[in-house]
């Protein structure tokens, strides 16, 4: 046991000496290199969290670089959430962190999410902030964070147990599905674009009437607004939502000028 203890102490001393030998630059010429100058998130619905995005910050200089402070310039005002090298920029501490070391030839990972507040507009609005890195040398470097936020009418689930009409210039987002009871009619009139979550669809036991118009289809699609690949939006990938299911008790359904896509069934 003693021998093992001394071996472990020797290994610790080696790592300690390596750490002590690392020098950190205060030269204004030594900078971080970022994987992007602007991190563009996809269009999102207000109050609904985005997926997690990320980028790398590299130290390609011959010395270590200390980041004395990293912060969101607008604090908690825009809804961005950031984690830098495992440190969450907590809103209670001013959305900032201090004293992050990036050793020579090393890198750190930055993760970004956004839940934007309601903006009060019918069209998408730009949401942006700057993630500022202040180096020990006094140099300040920034990465712009931006997204387009879209106010929507949100339903977790919608049970139609009486005659109901849906129509809105705003997007309609349904997280868990729509059920039309056997004694009810759901009428959807253009303008109407309905975005369904992955487990959502329309189960019709009563009657479903869709009334689009020439040049103004009623649109039903999945709620993913981002891309599977750079060249392929999720909107063009099947299986993004459950589609429409007509049950035995359903009758007299009419579909006029309906654009239904990216579903599993229809």
Please tell me what each predicted stretch does.
Residues 57-61:
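Asparagine-centered strand-capping/turn motif at beta-strand->loop junctions
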Residues 71-96:
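Short, solvent-exposed loop/linker segments at beta-strand-coil boundaries, enriched for Pro/Gly
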């Amino acid at each position: 046991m003693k021998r093992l203890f001394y071996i472990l102490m020797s290994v610790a001393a080696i790592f300690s000496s390596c750490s002590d030998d690392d020098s950190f630059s205060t030269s204004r010429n030594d900078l971080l290199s970022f994987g992007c100058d602007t991190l563009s998130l996809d269009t999102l619905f207000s109050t609904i969290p985005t997926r997690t995005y990320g980028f790398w910050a590299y130290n390609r200089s011959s010395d270590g670089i200390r980041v004395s402070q990293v912060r969101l310039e607008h604090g908690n005002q825009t809804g961005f959430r950031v984690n830098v090298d495992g440190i969450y920029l907590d809103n209670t501490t001013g959305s900032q962190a201090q004293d992050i070391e990036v050793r020579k030839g090393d890198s750190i990972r930055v993760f970004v999410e956004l839940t934007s507040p309601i903006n009060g507009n019918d069209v998408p609005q730009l949401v942006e902030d700057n993630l500022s890195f202040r180096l020990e040398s006094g140099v300040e470097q920034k990465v712009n964070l931006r997204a387009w936020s879209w106010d929507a009418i949100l339903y977790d689930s919608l049970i139609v147990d009486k005659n109901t009409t849906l129509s809105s210039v705003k997007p309609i987002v349904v997280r868990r599905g729509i059920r039309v009871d056997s004694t009810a009619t759901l009428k959807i009139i253009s303008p109407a674009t309905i975005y369904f979550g992955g487990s959502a669809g329309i189960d019709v036991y009563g009657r479903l009437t869709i009334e689009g118009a020439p040049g103004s289809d009623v649109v039903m699609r999945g709620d993913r607004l981002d891309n599977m690949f750079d060249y392929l939006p999720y909107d063009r990938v099947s299986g993004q939502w459950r589609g429409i299911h007509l049950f035995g008790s359903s009758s007299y359904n009419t579909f006029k000028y309906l654009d239904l896509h990216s579903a599993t069934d229809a």
